[in-house]
Amino acid sequence: MADLEEQLSDEEKVRIAAKFIIHAPPGEFNEVFNDVRLLLNNDNLLREGAAHAFAQYNLDQFTPVKIEGYEDQVLITEHGDLGNGKFLDPKNRICFKFDHLRKEATDPRPYEAENAIESWRSSVETALRAYVKEHYPNGVCTVYGKKIDGQQTIIACIESHQFQAKNFWNGRWRSEWKFTVTPSITQVVGILKIQVHYYEDGNVQLVSHKDIQDSLTVSNEAQTAKEFIKIVEAAENEYQTAISENYQTMSDTTFKALRRQLPVTRTKIDWNKILSYKIGKEMQNA
C-alpha cells in the first residue's frame, strides 16, 4: 500500500477523491467526504483540487438550499448557475452566494432575470408548486425562464428526498422538464431520475433514469401551465409505478432464480425479505 501511495501523484490522488465525491449516494456526501479526507490526509489538496467535485455533486443532485429571510427553498442547478459561486432564485428575483462544501446560501441580492418570459415562468411555477405539494411531501421545485438559441424556454426542476440513515437507506428523486414557448404546439422534453442506497445487512443501490418526450398545446399562460402539469404527472406516475412493479417481479423471480437450494452456510435464506427493501415504494411515497 505504501508503494502504491508513493507511485500516485497529487493530481492522481485528487482525481480519485473527486470521483468518490461525485458518486456519493444521496444524503451521504459528508460521510464520503470525511472518508476521502482521511485517505488523502491533505486538507489543502482536497479543498483546492476537488472543489469542482463539490460543485458538480450539488448541481447533479439538485441540492435544495434555504436562503435566510425567504420562505421557500431553491434548487442548486446548472440552469441557475450565474458563475463565480453565485446562483439565481427566479421566484424571488434574487441571486446569492453558495458554499458547495457547507451547502449554505449567503449574501442574497436583487437580480433581474428574463423579464420577457416572466409571466410564463410564473404561471408554470404556480402550477408546478401545487403539483409538487400534492405528490412530494418533501419536494422542492424551481422554474427558470431563459432565452436559449434565441427561443424563450421554460425549465422546470423537481427534487424530493428522504434520508433515513437510522434505517440504513437514503433516496432522492429528480426530474427536469423543458419546453419552448412557441405558437400552437411545442415539444416537452423531460428526464426522470431516481437514486436509492440501502445498506442494512448488505449494500444495494438503485440508479435509474427515463427520458420523456411529449407534445404540448400552447395557448395562454395559465392553460399551457395546466396542460404541462398533466404531462408531468402522467409521466412521473407511470415511471414510479413501473419501478415498483419491477421490484415486485425481481423479488418473485430473478432473486429466487439466483439462490442455491441450501447456501454454503447450510441455512435457508428468506428471499422474500428482499422485498422488504421497498425501495421503489418508499420513493413513490417520498
UniProtKB/Swiss-Prot annotation:
GO terms for biological process: actin cytoskeleton organization; barbed-end actin filament capping. The keyword Acetylation applies. Pfam families: F-actin_cap_A (PF01267). The modification N-acetylalanine is found at A2. The modification Phosphoserine is found at S9. PANTHER family: F-ACTIN-CAPPING PROTEIN SUBUNIT ALPHA, F-ACTIN-CAPPING PROTEIN SUBUNIT ALPHA-2. Component of the F-actin capping complex, composed of a heterodimer of an alpha and a beta subunit. Component of the WASH complex, composed of F-actin-capping protein subunit alpha (CAPZA1, CAPZA2 or CAPZA3), F-actin-capping protein subunit beta (CAPZB), WASHC1, WASHC2, WASHC3, WASHC4 and WASHC5. Interacts with RCSD1/CAPZIP. Belongs to the F-actin-capping protein alpha subunit family. This is F-actin-capping protein subunit alpha-2. It comes from Oryctolagus cuniculus. The gene is CAPZA2.
